[in-house]
Amino acid sequence: MAKVYIENVRDLVEKAGEIREKLALATRRIGNVHIGGPMSATDVTTAIYYKYMGFDPDNLDDPNRDRFILSKGHNGILLFTIFCDMGMYDWDLLLDTYNTIGHPFGAHPNHKRVKGIEVSTGSLGHGLSWCCGIGHANRGRGIKSRIWTLLGDGEMEEGSNWEAILYAASHNLDNIVAVVDFNHASAAYETNQNERWGEKGGPEGMADCFRAFGWNATVIDGTVMKEIDKTLAALPEVTLNGKPNAIICSTTKGQGVGFMMERPCAWHIGGFDDDKLAEAEKDIKEYTAKKLAEV
């Protein structure tokens, strides 16, 4: 397998569209899958994996590699889809065996079964703690690679996250990048005006919380690839003695599929019939074309 690298923003937009189409097909073939979150996190995850991580399927044990921890582990189908797209796994194997006994692809990612998965996740609020441990170990070895983690806005209510956020800042772990997919909905309720995010609420309120804990924090439109690309490119150089970085991506659960975005909580998990699949595919093609026109 050759290392996949996409430089051009327009090509990243097209790749994100391809990933969304595959996620829609997976939702039809599998029948019941966490789908709202993967759709909203597709753009930033595509940019990280195909451009900024230097992800190399042939060198997954390189001690100097960047690492990606999917803290919101119920979005594992997104990483599995990317791995299949990169040629690491057979696409039909994923669709035919997903979440079945004895096969690698579970509803939550298992690092013992799926190469490319750094940490088994699913129980929320653990990704940042893993980042702290790996960040410390890398600093001790003088390794200046980044440790990325993708979190959900609902997940950010877990107290363990804020313990890790405080720890990372107080220990100057600037090799950590926390990316929050703020898609404004958990499995049960909207998260935008959560009182935990201060008077502002929403992504800006959450960013203020990160800053109060000693982090650099940036809020971006997580649906605009050009903005994602600019933000990731501007991350400070890792010194192993600076502030960790948080990127709060404002998105909508089910991003790119109209009927999902209209009822985001209802599409935390679900499945498509043939009609829904056709509608989703049409929406994704139109959405991708619109985003390409904006580049």
Regions found by a protein language model. Give the residues of each.
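Structured core elements
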Residues: 69, 177, 219, 246-248
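Glycine/aspartate-rich loop-and-adjacent alpha/beta segment that forms the canonical ThDP
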Residues: 209, 225-295
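Structural motif
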Residues: 31-39
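N-terminal capping segment at the start of a domain
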Residues: 15-32, 181
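N-terminal hydrophobic or amphipathic helices/low-complexity stretches enriched
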Residues: 1-19, 23
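Thiamine diphosphate
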Residues: 116, 120-239
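Cofactor-binding active-site loop characterized by glycine-rich and histidine/acidic residues
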Residues: 26, 38-170
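Short secondary-structure boundary/capping segments
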Residues: 86, 193-195, 261-265
